[in-house]
Amino acid sequence: MKRRAGLGGSMRSVVGFLSQRGLHGDPLLTQDFQRRRLRGCRNLYKKDLLGHFGCVNAIEFSNNGGQWLVSGGDDRRVLLWHMEQAIHSRVKPIQLKGEHHSNIFCLAFNSGNTKVFSGGNDEQVILHDVESSETLDVFAHEDAVYGLSVSPVNDNIFASSSDDGRVLIWDIRESPHGEPFCLANYPSAFHSVMFNPVEPRLLATANSKEGVGLWDIRKPQSSLLRYGGNLSLQSAMSVRFNSNGTQLLALRRRLPPVLYDIHSRLPVFQFDNQGYFNSCTMKSCCFAGDRDQYILSGSDDFNLYMWRIPADPEAGGIGRVVNGAFMVLKGHRSIVNQVRFNPHTYMICSSGVEKIIKIWSPYKQPGCTGDLDGRIEDDSRCLYTHEEYISLVLNSGSGLSHDYANQSVQEDPRMMAFFDSLVRREIEGWSSDSDSDLSESTILQLHAGVSERSGYTDSESSASLPRSPPPTVDESADNAFHLGPLRVTTTNTVASTPPTPTCEDAASRQQRLSALRRYQDKRLLALSNESDSEENVCEVELDTDLFPRPRSPSPEDESSSSSSSSSSEDEEELNERRASTWQRNAMRRRQKTTREDKPSAPIKPTNTYIGEDNYDYPQIKVDDLSSSPTSSPERSTSTLEIQPSRASPTSDIESVERKIYKAYKWLRYSYISYSNNKDGETSLVTGEADEGRAGTSHKDNPAPSSSKEACLNIAMAQRNQDLPPEGCSKDTFKEETPRTPSNGPGHEHSSHAWAEVPEGTSQDTGNSGSVEHPFETKKLNGKALSSRAEEPPSPPVPKASGSTLNSGSGNCPRTQSDDSEERSLETICANHNNGRLHPRPPHPHNNGQNLGELEVVAYSSPGHSDTDRDNSSLTGTLLHKDCCGSEMACETPNAGTREDPTDTPATDSSRAVHGHSGLKRQRIELEDTDSENSSSEKKLKT
């Protein structure tokens, strides 16, 4: 201190000294001194900055020292404060020339403190130059802008969050007509966004419905993490990173502030205190201290709360709740919404419903009040009653709860009374069936969205809340509601009993009430026109009641309303303008809804999954029953987009060829794998674990099967050689499908599933292995046994004979009696005769390698049958070679088993067959069964 005495004995500014001093020796002495100073305080000195004409909704310190403070509010002006001059010489702030058309909700400095970004209810972001106060650029949005954040490494990049549910990344170097980069797009509003100060590719957001999320700019449209554990779907209004970017502080509606580690969904700590609540207005939070060891948040009880973050991570018990604030700063006269901390000067700035900005400091400033011990208490004030609020609005003559035309920095009792009304409703819990005066209801309807983000209720507005019976004069005098000791000076108070109006006052009041009723009717009419459907009705309710965003009156409106306080005609004209504004906003919302609905149609052609062939053919499975559209919106939307294409007929020739090629690839892959088993390889699939293909282990088949069954198994693997007949039409296909749900054989069920694969392969791939079946299938002596009661055998008509090629049979239950299985297998062998092509048409239910084409034949026009026949003949020729190779696999006993549908009894055949002599005898038996099958085939055709 003494070393700096000669530098300027005239330096009386504590702020200037704190920003310019330099202690020689240990560089940590400065931080340690300030840390000890704050730690020993029970209260802080406070001082007010006057300059705004309405609620102050946004404040931000400049970077690298906090020499400047920028503020904005309902008066639509952006003010720039030089902190040292504003505190010591009461210099007026600098008003930037760029002015918004409505309330200002968010502000941001760039890293060099040369530019200021401001966003608000007028659906635009204005870029200001600090030195010249000129407007550099304007960035238009589609809805109100609630949050801004500038990249810590590039001053040309900034992020904005808006009421339309989008988070946009902007580059100020782009042309004015350039489109921003959309990082997130939700149906609910984003209230806050912030870049990570250390890792600029990460951003944190606060959403009104989805809660707090972490995003990577390299992975748009999908959040990396949603915080909150099982309570992640919460209404969040503010989010802030600490200086290291390792922790997140978030504010949630009607819940205490919460601290997260960026890598964990579960909260580290929650902070609470008796009297703290956050439900009436939108608020912000911030870290405090040189090491971010404190957090700050305003409250609806007019106080500012500071909590200390415990050093022990296990503090707070099971719920990790830190009860008891480190410091409660009392001095505001209404709700505290915004708070910021300057780590260089240890100053705290707070603002809210009042027109003032309050400065808190552990160092005494010129003209400040309060002390560090909390012994000096301010006078408390009572909340305005509802009658007082109504009387103030009616007697003002303008019909508004705020008046910016007077350009007064003094406290506005109407605005204070309006938010007192909100606080009363929240605490007292008004009853919905109470009787109330008509004038009160109309006034509350008129002011459903007054003061917006400053007084903007997250779920309840003055119009949507129920009414309570007005108290009597005695009740209002005796039962004045106190929010604890509200230590503020009692100025601009009004009597609890409004004066008795004269006859002229009653007549003018009646005219105003009639004008208000007409305005209310027009507003309701506009809302009813907007609500064309139930979804739009919900959206209108959210926009008008849950999140009201009324606009501040323009100067023309202000002048007309102030000059015609006694003229009902001018008031009616003003109300008509408001009604037209509501209708315009309704039209814009409808247009935006139609624009959002249009892109959903062209999404169908993006189904590129059919064309790609990755040789990894997963099992077909049902969608995960445990997931719901609400739990995973991304997954549900993709499911809804893909499923319609599965039910629609495929008339595109290229799509048909791709399906045939895919079926051929799958069959070729199956036969190559089967032929490789002759070298003694073990099963490629056990259970349901490998690549989504079902299988069985070698232990599941202890007993060898008969030679006849072995021949049938070989015939099954080599059967896919015939061309699909033209008779296999929709009628033939529909005969099989009714049997698939429960009472048909297991192969029929899998056949139906495979018929749907070509359109939905991609979707089924992502959900493999998530469905559990109520029973298991075991193999005993080469035959399928089911854990449930055995069903009677199916009729002799061979249905779904080729359904064993289902790639997803691992997920489909296989329940079939022994007789029905042998009958279906004999029919298969009789039709295909061990790979030799029949000179006659095959069985009409042939589903072999053409099973993938069955859907095409059933759903496409007859004109495509020639194309299918040509491709099928080529497929049959190639597969005949593979079948010849697969015959040799039967000579090796105890070969690896596969329960892939094409090779279902392959294990039994490999154990039972030991030479070519047995094969010859079995072929003779098969040829004998050809005659039997031909007769049954003729009966079926007739």
Swiss-Prot record:
Q: Where is the composition biased (Basic and acidic residues)?
A: 690-701, 728-738
Q: Where is the composition biased (Polar residues)?
A: 454-465, 760-770, 801-815
**GO CC annotation, single:** nucleoplasm
Recorded hits in Gene3D superfamilies, A to Z, give: YVTN repeat-like/Quinoprotein amine dehydrogenase
Q: What is this protein called?
A: DDB1- and CUL4-associated factor 5
Q: Which UniProt keywords apply?
A: Phosphoprotein, Repeat, Ubl conjugation pathway, WD repeat
One short Pfam family name for this protein?
A: WD40
Region spans: Disordered? 449-478, 490-509, 544-655, 676-824, 889-942
* UniProt WD repeat ranges: 51-91, 99-139, 140-180, 185-225, 277-317, 331-370
Q: Quick check: keyword GTP-binding in the entry?
A: no
Report the PROSITE patterns cross-referenced here: WD_REPEATS_2, WD_REPEATS_REGION
- Complex and partners: Interacts with DDB1, CUL4A or CUL4B. Interacts with L3MBTL3. Interacts with DNMT1. Interacts with E2F1. Interacts with SOX2.
Tissue expr: Ubiquitous.
Instruction: From the UniProt record, give one GO term of the biological process aspect.
Output: negative regulation of fatty acid biosynthetic process
Q: Which residues carry this modification: Phosphoserine?
A: 531, 533, 626, 628, 645, 648, 651, 794
Compositional bias ranges of the Low complexity kind: 625-641
Q: Which residues are modified to Phosphothreonine?
A: 500
